[in-house]
């Protein structure tokens, strides 16, 4: 069940997708005198766009006229592996800390894992390629929202890569209240399963 994360991406029309199935089920019932019960699990379709990752801009690097402007953030494949794995696209928005008008600037976004593949702006369907995005001009410390993160993000991330702790998660309720659903890991929790053999102590 394709769900469009980016502007212009088409999502599956569930009504259209179901029409051929309905007619086949009706035909089966007429021919065999019994009705079939079908259950589907379109989980991603329902929750992908219900979640967002909030990161912060940690550094801004300009590699010159023939290079790129990079935004380095305090997140990456430890929370959203999809871009690095298969060139998946996620909507990204820089949120200025100050209420001011800023220009639009072309950026590549790099994660914090010290991996050449930890990039949140690959070419579509090509994790080996790079594709810049026009975003609001960023400053160090600005928050960044990475949308479409409600499915196949935390659940398939490179957890604890480079000993980064698992991020906290919250739910934003209908009334605007925020509720913690998972605490951020401590370093002790990251290391708790490590054992040092006796002969090395």
Where does each model-flagged region fall?
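Active-site-proximal beta-alpha loop/turn segments in soluble metabolic enzymes
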Residues: 1-13, 42-46
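Well-ordered, non-membrane alpha-helical segments in soluble/globular domains
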Residues: 8-24
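Charged (often Lys/Glu-rich) extended helix/loop segments that serve as interaction or gating elements
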Residues: 20-22, 26-201
